[in-house]
A protein has these predicted regions:
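Short helix-boundary/capping micro-motifs
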Residues: 12-27
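Hydrophobic two-helix hairpin corresponding to the core of helix-turn-helix DNA-binding domains
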Residues: 9-10, 22-23, 60-63
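A short LG(V/I)-centered, amphipathic sequence patch enriched
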Residues: 41-59
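DNA major-groove recognition helices of helix-turn-helix
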Residues: 9, 39-40
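Alpha-helical linker/hinge and terminal dimerization helices associated
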Residues: 43-44, 66-88
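Conserved small/polar residues in nucleotide/adenosyl-binding loops
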Residues: 90-92
Length: 92
């Protein structure tokens, strides 16, 4: 489980479940995004997204709960980065 996987899930939802668009927005490949999301699902033991074949159709109910946690985690990571930047300016 890592922050890249969290960002991929978040961006996939932002891009209306279009992994190609999510990959473009994150400057990476669509197969990489797809693989990372599947690996996260396997690690968590749930399906974040309902699929029809290879196409993502919707966020599952457990996926919605995971997404809420992902959003909190990524928001806190950004807060930590901001704190680090502010403190590094003070110590220069």
């Amino acid at each position: 489980m890592n922050l890249h996987q969290f960002r991929f899930v978040q961006e996939a939802v932002r891009r209306n479940l279009n992994l190609t668009e999510a990959a473009k927005a994150l400057h990476t490949s669509q197969p990489g995004v797809s693989k990372a999301i599947i690996e996260l699902e396997e690690e968590l033991g749930i399906e974040i997204f309902a699929r029809h074949g290879k196409r993502i159709k919707r966020v599952t109910e457990p996926g919605a709960q995971v997404l809420k946690s992902i959003e909190v985690i990524l928001r806190e990571v950004n807060n930590l980065k901001r704190i680090g930047e502010q403190l590094s300016l003070i110590h220069i």
